[in-house]
A protein has these predicted regions:
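Class I SAM-dependent methyltransferase SAM/SAH-binding core
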Residues: 59-104
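A C-terminal cap/extension of S-adenosyl-L-methionine-dependent methyltransferases
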Residues: 97, 142, 158, 162-163, ...
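A short glycine-rich, Lys/Arg-flanked "PGG" loop and its adjoining helix->strand segment in the class I
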Residues: 128-142
Length: 240
């Protein structure tokens, strides 16, 4: 596990030096639309008085918007370089940044009302991370995550072909998820009311002139049996 964490710290340094937003594809017009959709998926469940743990906050792309909910946000990452950028991007009084390993959290059990994150679980040793998430949640606490879908053809190639992985700026150990095994793992960990839905057919490199039409078509495909399984991402919700 320590070797994996060391690689992620090194990867965080790479992202900080080379522009995380570009590597993560949040900066393009289509990328910004995809980002906004994920923000809503995570933040719409939060509100004042809630204690929320954000895993893998990175440069604070999502932290800033989560803070607008009024919840008390503890935003964590293993990378000090990314956390420094996050602090500059969002210095809201209801946000606290900490260096933490998501697979070995220092928090007491039953501390958080919700644990959230975007594109973070696939960087972790998933079994250990889910046990820690479950432990730090309050009874009836909830999780909300968006993660890459291994059934998507581009994602499958990107996560499994080493030279492609390097070209896209992935970290060495990151992967993606098949939703049914992930669902079973969540249930084995103790979570209930597990829902995992594929979503997002909009590619971040989509030309501006085509974004509206392709986004609408993608939303249509998300409701099509079988075809929806090949969407680019998974929306994960569950209750302790």
């Amino acid at each position: 596990m320590q070797d994996r964490v060391a690689k992620e710290i090194q990867h965080g340094r790479f992202l900080a030096e080379h522009g995380a937003g570009e590597i993560w594809n949040w900066e393009s017009p289509a990328g910004k639309l995809r980002w906004a959709r994920r923000v809503k998926m995570l933040s719409s469940h939060l509100g004042p008085g809630m204690s929320v743990l954000e895993l893998g906050c990175g440069t604070g792309y999502f932290t800033r918007e989560l803070a607008r909910s009024g919840a008390e946000i503890v935003a964590i990452d293993v990378s000090p370089e990314l956390l420094e950028i996050a602090g500059a991007n969002c210095s809201a009084p209801n946000v606290r940044y900490e260096i933490q390993n998501a697979s070995a959290l220092s928090y007491p059990g039953g501390m958080f009302d919700a644990v959230v994150g975007s594109s973070v679980l696939h960087h972790l040793g998933i079994e250990e991370a889910l046990r820690e998430i479950y432990r730090v949640l309050k009874p009836t606490g909830t999780i909300y995550f968006t993660e890459p879908n291994m059934l998507n053809p581009q994602i499958a190639i990107q996560k499994n072909v080493p030279w492609v992985k390097r070209k896209f700026g992935d970290s060495p150990d990151e992967t993606a998820f098949f939703r049914w095994p992930l669902r079973r793992l969540l249930e084995i960990t103790g979570f209930r009311d597990v829902r995992i839905d594929p979503f997002d057919f909009l590619h971040p490199k989509t030309p501006i002139a085509l974004i509206d039409r392709l986004n609408a078509f993608g939303r249509f495909l998300e409701n099509m049996p079988v075809i929806s399984e090949f969407a680019g991402s998974l929306y994960i919700r569950a209750v302790k």
